[in-house]
């Protein structure tokens, strides 16, 4: 590999398919998509925009937190496990959070939860998601050690905010999180910001990262999976939204941020890397959506498996390599 993965883990059983000979793109889809259908659970209307991580990686296992909209159309979070990263056993019961502190018992009454991300930092798995506070969207924060018991902490920010994504280690001694301040509705605007915290409770030192730039992302953007630390900087996938005559179109691309000051953009791909083109991405509860929430990365080979929600209905997977995507972002950068 030309680009080194920093603080990565070996994943010899990472889900993988070689790039098709006729593929001209830097990211290619799994040929058996979607990997999680909308009706995998008896109560599910849809399962999408979900996050997975290596879990007991020495045993080749994976775990995740899944967005499940039930048949009452409640937005819930469920835990799940897999032996291969493709076939998932999702708990039919939603996560019921225990409170990390007694002071949050009254505040953290469950309303809804969606679009989770999962990030391993130091000794535990941190979960962030769009959480209801007074039925207004903000960033919920919780942690787990085993994906069976989850401890909910203070919300990170005031409403209205979405797309809370943690960095996988402290930077300059502080936890770092992406977010996208928003409004109460289907946000018609949005820039990405970074906030910092000494303790995962009090967040400040907010820094603007970037806003919409090109036509494919001209309406709003938001952070996607957990950033990948490389020798070039932080490799970050993010989604961008075009407002067309037929509604919103959600695509995704990538950028590379400075390693020590991650609010500084070194490279930003001018083009989308994957957009809704397959039937399962274009047709569903919300048409024309590809929404990445997680990656698995093998430090030995540089292989990346990307998990993304499709049409707010199901979960699919795509592939690339660190070298391929870094080279492409650098050679097609708009900054």
Curated annotation (Swiss-Prot):
User: What is the activity's pH dependence per the UniProt entry?
Assistant: Optimum pH is 6.5.
Q: Report which reactions are catalysed by this protein.
A: [(1->4)-beta-D-mannosyl](n) + phosphate = [(1->4)-beta-D-mannosyl](n-1) + alpha-D-mannose 1-phosphate
Organism superkingdom: Bacteria
Gene3D superfamilies found in the cross-reference section: Glycosyl hydrolase domain, family 43 (2.115.10.20)
Query: Which keywords accompany this UniProt record?
Result: Carbohydrate metabolism, Cell wall biogenesis/degradation, Glycosyltransferase, Transferase
Its activity depends on temperature as follows:
Optimum temperature is 45 degrees Celsius.
**CDD domains on file:** GH130 (cd08993)
Give GO MF terms, alphabetically: glycosyltransferase activity
The UniProt entry, under InterPro entries, shows: Glyco_hydro_beta-prop_sf (IPR023296), Mannoside_phosphorylase (IPR007184)
| Gene Ontology biological process terms, A to Z | cell wall organization
Supply the EC number(s): 2.4.1.319
Additional information:
Both RaMP1 (Rumal_0852) and RaMP2 catalyze the phosphorolysis of a beta-1,4-mannosidic linkage at the non-reducing end of a substrate, but acceptor specificities are clearly different.
Q: What is the role of this chain?
A: Catalyzes the phosphorolysis of beta-1,4-mannooligosaccharides to mannose 1-phosphate (Man1P) and shorter mannooligosaccharides. Can also catalyze the phosphorolysis of 4-O-beta-D-mannopyranosyl-D-glucopyranose (Man-Glc), but shows higher activity toward longer mannooligosaccharides. Involved in a mannan catabolic pathway which feeds into glycolysis.
Q: Describe the subunit structure.
A: Homohexamer in solution.
For this chain, the family text in UniProt reads: Belongs to the glycosyl hydrolase 130 family.
Q: What is this protein called?
A: Beta-1,4-mannooligosaccharide phosphorylase
């Amino acid at each position: 590999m030309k680009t080194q993965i920093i603080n990565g883990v070996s994943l010899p059983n990472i889900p993988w398919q070689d790039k098709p000979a006729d593929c001209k793109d830097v990211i290619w889809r799994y040929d058996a998509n979607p990997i999680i259908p909308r009706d995998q659970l008896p109560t599910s209307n849809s399962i999408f925009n979900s996050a997975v991580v290596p879990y007991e990686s020495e045993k080749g296992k994976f775990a995740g937190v899944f967005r499940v909209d039930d048949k009452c159309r409640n937005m819930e979070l469920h835990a799940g496990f897999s032996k291969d990263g493709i076939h998932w056993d999702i708990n039919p019961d939603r996560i019921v959070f225990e409170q990390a502190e007694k002071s949050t018992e009254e505040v953290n009454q469950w309303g809804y939860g969606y679009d989770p991300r999962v990030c391993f930092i130091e000794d535990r798995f941190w979960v962030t998601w769009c959480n209801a506070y007074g039925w207004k969207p903000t960033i919920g924060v919780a942690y787990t050690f085993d994906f069976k018991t989850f401890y909910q902490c203070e919300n990170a920010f005031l409403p209205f905010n979405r797309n809370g994504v943690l960095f996988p280690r402290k930077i300059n001694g502080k936890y770092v999180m992406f977010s996208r301040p928003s409004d109460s509705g289907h946000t018609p605007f949005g820039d990405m910001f970074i906030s910092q915290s000494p303790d995962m409770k009090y967040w400040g030192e907010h820094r603007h990262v970037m806003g919409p730039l090109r036509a494919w992302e001209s309406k709003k953007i938001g952070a996607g999976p957990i950033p990948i630390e490389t020798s070039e900087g932080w490799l970050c996938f993010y989604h961008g939204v075009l407002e067309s005559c037929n509604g919103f179109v959600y695509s995704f691309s990538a950028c590379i941020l400075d390693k020590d000051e991650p609010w500084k953009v070194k490279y930003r791909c001018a083009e989308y890397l994957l957009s809704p083109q397959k039937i399962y991405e274009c047709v569903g509860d919300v048409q024309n959506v590809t929404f990445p929430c997680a990656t698995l990365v093998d430090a030995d080979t540089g292989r990346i498996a990307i998990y993304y929600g499709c049409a707010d209905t199901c979960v699919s997977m795509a592939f690339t390599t660190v070298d391929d995507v870094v080279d492409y972002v650098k050679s097609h950068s708009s900054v």
